[in-house]
């Protein structure tokens, strides 16, 4: 998926910002969250998050669901590198395994469990 954040900010800027965030907040991880193409869920009001490393993916789902005002019966799926992460993993684990060279973790969200292009 093409992330708008990457389109809006050149790599060097993102890398410098990612490094600065990791130094200043070692117990938190920088995450970019954007809606997947063709997803029929609302847009987020912001896409950059600084998340506690020990927050679980399940807790992060809850946080994002609240921000986009999803009803309990509405489905929501996260994708990290085109894969749905386990809800029991911590955001710190997910970050360590999947962050990009700019020190950001990129998460796409959708109402579909299949990653659309």
Curated annotation (Swiss-Prot):
Phenotype upon changing residue 9 to A: Abolished interaction with ATG4B
Q: Which residues are assigned to the propeptide feature?
A: 117
Q: Which GO terms describe its molecular function?
A: beta-tubulin binding; GABA receptor binding; phosphatidylethanolamine binding; phospholipid binding; Tat protein binding; ubiquitin protein ligase binding
| Location in the cell | Cytoplasmic vesicle, Autophagosome; Cytoplasmic vesicle membrane; Cytoplasm, Cytoskeleton; Endoplasmic reticulum
Q: Where is this site: (Microbial infection) Cleavage?
A: 115-116
Q: Which UniProt keywords apply?
A: Autophagy, Cytoplasm, Cytoplasmic vesicle, Cytoskeleton, Endoplasmic reticulum, Golgi apparatus, Host-virus interaction, Lipoprotein, Membrane, Microtubule
For the biological process aspect of GO, one term held by this record is: glycophagy
Site feature (Cleavage) residues: 116-117
Q: Which family does it belong to?
A: Belongs to the ATG8 family.
Q: What is this protein called?
A: Gamma-aminobutyric acid receptor-associated protein-like 1
Q: What is the lineage of its organism?
A: Eukaryota, Metazoa, Chordata, Craniata, Vertebrata
Q: Give the gene that encodes this protein.
A: GABARAPL1
